[in-house]
Curated annotation (Swiss-Prot):
HAMAP family: MraZ. It comes from the Bacteria. Residues 5-52, 81-124 form the SpoVT-AbrB domain. SUPFAM superfamilies: AbrB/MazE/MraZ-like. Keywords: Cytoplasm, DNA-binding, Repeat, Transcription, Transcription regulation. InterPro entries: MraZ, MraZ_C, MraZ_dom, MraZ_N, MraZ_sf, SpoVT-AbrB_dom, SpoVT-AbrB_sf. Belongs to the MraZ family. It is found in: Cytoplasm, Nucleoid. The gene is mraZ. PANTHER family: TRANSCRIPTIONAL REGULATOR MRAZ. The keyword Cell inner membrane does not apply. GO terms for biological process: negative regulation of DNA-templated transcription initiation. This is Transcriptional regulator MraZ.
């Protein structure tokens, strides 16, 4: 499981160096093979270990092409998906089209999300996080039923 927030720098070639605690897990879980694609709701990228992505991709491919929203989702997620290899130093090259989509230059934030990571431009992450905290404070009484019994 991947968790935690890490502030990182992309190097001059656009490579992301995964923190060592995640690097070891990626190398043992999927031999460092990951898939990066866009998040179609936010301007960030999503990184999945290859086995996780293959399961998602199977589900996406099974969606009906004649349904416009399903076809759009497939185009965005599968169309932007790139297989990446984490090298021995724990780095993976983030392809230029993906960096451009998410507005990634140097300062980035890597967010562990259980079975995947999100990669954000640092300033956009700080802005969105502040927005979400504000929204959460305003909507506290409106928790979905599934969350009402969760003690945090």
């Amino acid at each position: 499981m991947f968790r935690g927030v890490n502030q990182l720098n992309l190097d001059a070639k656009g490579r992301l160096a995964f923190p060592s605690r995640h690097r070891d897990r990626l190398l043992s879980h999927c031999s460092g093979e990951v898939v990066a694609t866009i998040d179609y709701r936010d301007r960030c990228l999503v990184f999945y270990p290859l086995p996780e992505w293959e399961e998602i991709e199977r589900k996406l491919i099974a969606l009906p092409d004649l349904q416009p929203s399903a076809k759009r989702l497939k185009r965005l997620l599968i169309g932007h998906a790139q297989e990446l290899q984490v090298d021995g130093n724990g780095r993976a090259l983030v392809p230029p089209p993906l960096r451009e989509y998410a507005g990634l230059e140097k300062r980035v934030v890597l967010i562990g999300q259980g079975n995947k990571f999100e990669l954000w431009d640092e300033s956009l992450w700080e802005q969105r996080r502040a927005d979400w905290l504000q929204e959460a404070a305003a909507a506290d009484a409106e928790l979905p039923g599934e969350l009402e019994s969760l003690a945090l």
